[in-house]
A protein has these predicted regions:
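Phosphate/anion-contacting hairpin/loop surfaces
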Residues: 1-176
């Protein structure tokens, strides 16, 4: 099985402006437990300080998964059981915030490269290694560090099949 960490490609693409919005307040107050469903059909603008090109993956703050309707339509049936989607509108164009479910006990702690705070909390994971014998949904976040979203190979392949998509980057993770 192949597992990929997905994230926004920083390459001159526009970003969704959250500064000064209720969404920013919710993220600051709740961190990784923010509930995006509260913002269904809310209108957003592009940030003035971002790039010039609109992409299909304008993640919020670099790690909150946002897909264009084109991409979401391609993978909807694969992820509906493991993620919640919230429709938002950015300057007239529909996007979907995707909140993948958190799963636990799938990260191979011994093989992963993890940087920790003095109190033991995870600061960063430089190398994600997943357990071979675990069960994985099509899309997920890990309970230990729910900052990034991961997909299995079939989901990434379906995304890649959507012609003309831009803005997604991904990293293959080890499965041992």
């Amino acid at each position: 099985m192949k597992i990929y960490r997905i994230y926004h490609k920083v390459d001159g693409f526009k970003a969704i402006k959250t500064k000064g919005t209720a969404l920013e307040s919710c993220m600051l107050e709740n961190g990784n437990n923010a509930t995006f469903g509260l913002f269904k059909n809310q209108q957003f603008q592009w940030s003035d300080s971002a790039g010039e090109k609109v992409c299909d993956f304008p993640f919020i703050d670099g790690n909150i998964t946002v897909f264009s309707e084109k991409v979401f339509s391609a993978i909807r049936s694969m992820i509906t059981s493991c993620a919640v989607n919230t429709n938002i509108v950015v300057e007239g164009t529909q996007y979907e915030i995707i909140e993948a479910n958190k799963i636990s006990n799938v990260l191979n702690i011994e093989q992963s490269v993890i940087k920790r705070f003095k109190d033991g909390r995870i600061m960063n994971i430089k190398k994600y290694v997943f357990k071979q014998n675990a069960s994985y949904p099509a899309m997920f976040r890990i309970e230990e560090f729910p900052i990034f979203t991961f997909v299995i190979g079939e989901v990434l392949n379906k995304i890649k099949e959507s012609n003309g998509i831009e803005g997604l980057d991904f990293q293959l993770c080890e499965v041992l």
